[in-house]
Amino acid sequence: MEQDKLIIRGARENNLKNISLEIPRNKMVVMTGLSGSGKTSLAFDTIYAEGQRRYVESLSAYARMFLGGVEKPDVEQIEGLSPAISIDQKTTSNNPRSTVGTVTEIYDYLRLLYARCGVPYCPTHNIPITGQDISEMVAQVMSLEDGTRLTVMAPIIRNKKGTFKDQFAKLQKDGYVRVRVDGEIKLLEDDIELEKNKRHNIDVVIDRIIKKEEAKGRIHDSLETALNLAAGMAIVLEGDQEELFSSNYACRICGFSVPKLEPRLFSFNAPLGACDTCKGLGFTEEVDVDLLIPDKELSIREGAIRFYKNIVDTENIEWQTFETLMKAYKISLDVPVKKLTKKQMEIILHGSDRPISYKITSSGGNTYMRNDYIEGIKDMIERRYVETSSAMSKDWYHSFMIESKCPTCGGKRLNEQALSVRVGDRNIIEFTEQSVVNAMDWLEKTELTETQAKIAEQVIKEIGSRLRFLKDVGLDYLTLDRLAGTLSGGEAQRIRLATQIGSRLSGVLYVLDEPSIGLHQRDNAKLIDTLKNMRDLGNSLIVVEHDEETMLNADWIVDIGPGAGIHGGEVIFNGTPEEILKSEDSITGKYLSGRLRIDVPEQRRKGTGKAAELIGVSEHNLKHINVKFPLGKLVLVTGVSGSGKSTLVNECFMKAVQQNLGYTRIHPGKYEKVKGLNNIDKLVQIDQNPIGRTPRSNPATYTGVFDDIRSVFANTPEARLRGYDKGRFSFNVKGGRCEACWGDGVKVISMNFLPDVYVPCEVCHGKRYNEETLQCTFKGKNIYDVLEMTVEEGLELFANQPKIRNKLQTLCDVGLGYLKLGQSSTTLSGGEAQRVKLASELQKRATGKTVYILDEPTTGLHTDDVKRLIAVLEAIVDTGNTVIVIEHNLDVIKCADWIIDLGPEGGDNGGMIIAEGTPEQVAENPNSWTGQYLKKTLKWTKAKKEKKQK
């Protein structure tokens, strides 16, 4: 009998406190708890990791060498474990070739559809291009009336310049007698004179035949000769009427040809189909004059050209060469660049149009004579960017460049041949430019021929089912050509979820990380139904989630806590949703039952009375909207998924402010004009990206408190006696660190086909510093001991050090008191990383004119963490600053001073302002999806508050 429970015994991974529990199989199980409580450690680092390890262990040593090893999690035993698949929030891919269509495999099926059912059309004449075999051509000719006089010709030259003397001589040598030149029959034995610079059409007369049944073989042979001579083309002339035949896919009028249709012709990753200019990327990188010359008021000698700024009037060879170019064309180095003529700018950017003789003196005093073209600065940077192998040089050259739409394909990635093929009224790229919902509609309505329908039946079924799965997980607004790297974590996760649904696996354990992220409440029910469908196929689901609706729809809930970090790691509750509502121990249960809640503020802030305004915003799907962001308030930008929130805030507003503050390389989205940006003197974006990419980065180094701690240690009696400065207490530089492990505390041992093994350094025993440094102590603790402390413990140790105490207090204020000061940044969750950034910003002096931008800050946060986050955001606003938040969480939305709600739907049907105002005003707007859900929340919160007061 199959085991109906997943049994975990003795789980001790990260902060888990030797926990044991049983959870049902083939059910939807939600794991919840405060941020940092250990739910991810249990779900991903223990259960999924063990499932993955068992799979890898079952493979041969040779296969394991390529897969890499999976370390055994710190758990005594797991029973009843199925093959495990993880669907997390990591962005799908930053590869510019990866799109929604390729990730979901829809594009693979589309390529097959267009290869088998597509019809090429001439891009110039808009007529279908068809290829015939010779028997079809003969049959068409034989359908003419008997006695019809025919001339078979081979079109060898089409619309080309030249005299073609050599071609005429060869044709005569091969036995041909007549040619038709520009519509006029001529004898090859005559001296045919053609204008060299005029375009000509030349056809070779192969045969003149009277159509009759006995001539069928002769017609076949003549057509075959013509096809061989003219690369698959033949003309049959009947009086004044002529018919162009082609064994290729070629236009009968202009000869535009298409290779044999096959799936790789429609791949922008294959040379056959990719645009030759951009190689299938859809964009090219070129030097932007505004980045090269940011201030055109300056002269070249004053450093107007950023590339030469630091080498003006030096012996640098690059400057000598450039100065020679300027002298050769008498271009002044001392007039403002804006006064230079268009021709002079052409010389500066693209170089000389003739060779120049000049001499170069090297730094060693040697003189070299040269006579050559001198390259322009723009052309030189673009050439070097491609040629250099140095990452540093590449970054330097790239700082002058921008991405621009490919001039050849117009951003469509494919070459003209691939784009000429249509199914119905669209080519393959036009299909991918549609949103998921529009693509579904088009597939249903497009009429195919009987043959096409039969061929395409299974392919269309596969495409349609994948589109439906995307719609079911709330992604119907996405276009199939959307770059995977531009997706949010939640969108990327739901795409992988849709792909898994499409595979229809059963008997699998799926581990998901907050699939509801980025999803509006309206779409949540569809996602929950999708998860239930996966369960009903015979799969087990473990969902790490904070969303109340998802929890209440689960079959089972595991609550990890009671607190975070060292205060968590225990199973607080393990049972059904009905039971958790009555639990006295579970903080989650108290919020779900309404015993705990986040209160609505008593009153909304008035703000400063000033606003930043964008007029005529039309980037992506935004419909030429005018938006006011009131300053000195907590502003929430809301709307269903894909309605344009991130485009408005991140692409348009934020970049407009950054540009106004003097940031370079910033290109805001489309808008007509902007007002009120002078009321903002600083902009801070606080996202959930890691605070550091290496294990050496940690909360103490990021917030700057470690500098202060090192200063304290440098002032201890022992350190002063030995002459140590604060650099001695850094694990990143020589001096105080252990040189055996370079301050890492561990050494990596490569095991070839086994996973790398990390062993504590045998010299410092994992303490990162050398013995002399560790002998310096503060209140009995050395520098290693401090890094191993939690923020709360550090607060106690440094209670009499105001500078350190204040910085550590801000970390506690944002709910991170449980973090170790030296905890590697790579181990922090997105929510934790964001709060470390918040704490770092809170330490800085408020200007009162700062704008903070946060994109879905509640990701990874329990309702209790959200309560703390709201308090922090309100503290920032109370100092006169502005906080703009993109969010779906109703607890945050109801605490806003001002809401901008976009919609009404996602994608093409979004991009309009549906409602603006206080939460109470938006809640009364019947057209706002957010308002409808907000109205229920405000009523529910008010009712609970009144009940408690009674």
Task: Show which residues each predicted segment covers.
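Conserved phosphate-binding elements of NTP-dependent enzyme cores
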Residues: 1-950
